[in-house]
From Swiss-Prot:
Top-level taxonomic group: Bacteria
Native source organism of the sequence: Pectobacterium carotovorum subsp. carotovorum (strain PC1)
Protein name in the entry: Ribosome-recycling factor
Gene3D superfamilies linked to this entry: 3.30.1360.40, Ribosome-recycling factor
BP-aspect Gene Ontology terms: cytoplasmic translational termination
Primary localization: cytoplasm
Pfam families cross-referenced by the UniProt entry: RRF (PF01765)
PANTHER family on file: MITOCHONDRIAL RIBOSOME RECYCLING FACTOR PSEUDO 1 (PTHR20982:SF3), RIBOSOME RECYCLING FACTOR (PTHR20982)
This protein's UniProt keywords: Cytoplasm, Protein biosynthesis
Length: 185
């Protein structure tokens, strides 16, 4: 019983860390990465469609993304969607390929982005701790129902705490990597 609770907590904590990593991967650094454009929706036959479904996005060089649209008539709509996003990017069309140069980040913008990343990290830590709280509540309920002994409950809570520490360390590691990436010139 305690093993199931521990495994469930581990799975949920892993999902929390993955969600955090996914969230910070969308934050723009000085380097070109196709994931920067993941959140962009293009107007396609009257409905908003993710950019990845209507175009191929590749890294051309360290500061440029190249977008190859599957349907040529969509070129202007893709450019418009990128300009309308709050990423501060200015695409330029060159035939069938749309190039998106990434301007270098200013020092002030880097610091703002670091604040955002730290906020996301704190959200990640809080969600991991919430999973710990849920697991501990389940263990206390088992103890109350006399399904497990106090020693088993204590041991299981210690295991859950070790898991929590481990996953919070993973969040902190990802945060440190992203901060270092943001401060690169």
């Amino acid at each position: 019983m305690t093993n199931e609770i521990r495994k469930d907590a581990e799975t949920r904590m892993d999902k929390c860390v993955e969600a955090f990593k996914n969230q910070i991967s969308k934050i723009r650094t000085g380097r070109a990465s196709p994931s920067i454009l993941d959140g962009i929706q293009v107007e396609y036959y009257g409905s908003a469609t993710p950019l990845r479904q209507v175009a191929n996005v590749v890294v051309e060089d360290s500061r440029t993304l190249a977008i190859t649209v599957f349907d040529r008539t969509l070129g202007p709509a893709v450019e418009k969607a990128i300009m309308a996003s709050d990423l501060g990017l200015n695409p330029s069309s060159a035939g069938t390929v749309i190039r998106v140069p990434l301007p270098p980040l200013t020092e002030e913008r880097r610091k703002d982005l670091i604040k955002v990343v730290r906020g996301e990290a704190e959200q990640g830590r809080v969600s991991v701790r919430n999973v710990r709280r849920d697991a501990n509540d389940k263990l206390k309920a088992l103890l109350k129902d006399k399904a497990i002994s106090e020693d088993e409950e204590r041991r299981a809570q210690d295991d859950v705490q070790k898991l929590t520490d481990n996953f919070i360390k993973k969040v902190d590691t990802a945060l440190a990597e992203k901060e270092a990436e943001l401060m690169e010139f």
